[in-house]
Amino acid sequence: VGRPNVGKSTLLNRLVGEKMAIVSRRPQTTRTRITGIKHLPHAQVVFVDTPGLHEGTGRLGELMVRTAERALQDVDLVCLVLEATEKPERLDRAIFERLKGARVPVYAVLNKIDLVAPKSKLLALISACRAAFAFKEIVPVSAESGENCERLLALIVAAMPQRPPHFPRESLTDQPETFWVAETIREKIFRLTNQEVPYACAVRVAEISERKRPECLYIRASIFVERDSQKGILIGKGGATLKRIGTTAREDLERFFGIKVFLELTVAVRRNWRTDDRALKEFGFLLTS
């Protein structure tokens, strides 16, 4: 868990060793709970990436925060990801308050140490963290470069209770294929569009099927926005933006599935879907309890 844009998704991808979560420089890219499974010779660790803890605005923002908070109740260990570049006096005390009710060990993971020089600057932040909360461990890492991530993984494994594996060894996640297709498309939207457009987009995958002639995986998906102006921006002049989104998403999906992919994308307007419980449930965001 952690504030938006502190590198939680990059860290998940690094620890699992596969791309499990979409990554963007914009905050609040992750909207739902994402599970990644790390298989080791002597252990299986199930990681849960959550939306950033923030003051949720609007119905979708509220649900994202509830998803993150609910994840705290279902795990054996919590890693609070903080930016190593944060000044000690600017540490967010509110997030420590949210963690006081945690019934499991909490680690502070100080991410982005590759941006800190000299490393001695970390000492003040580590001291501030110790004074603010009873962390079981404080681990400086760089999810981007991988520095110290092996040590973090070892500390996580050591803290895990012994129980039978939850998943088969070939499993990397418990999410369906449609989820990963939608997330891949959404990542490209975040990277190739600006301002409010990526936040106003939802992706629904209507079909994934194998085709014989030519042999490929056929995927049909729709991107929903809230206004006609957003639709125009997403499509772009002569369809150029939508084509780039489709091409870059298809390339990632071909690597993911290991087969040629034909990706058909359409754009539709679903007005105010972020405040509509029916639409949120349709797009997989609404919690049922």
Label each region the model flagged:
Residues 30, 54-55, 87-88, 116-117, ...:
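Catalytic P-loop NTPase motifs of RecA-like helicase/translocase cores
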Residues 13, 32, 36, 66-73, ...:
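Solvent-exposed alpha-helical segments within well-ordered globular domains of core cellular machineries
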Residues 1-77, 82:
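Conserved G1/Walker A P-loop phosphate-binding module
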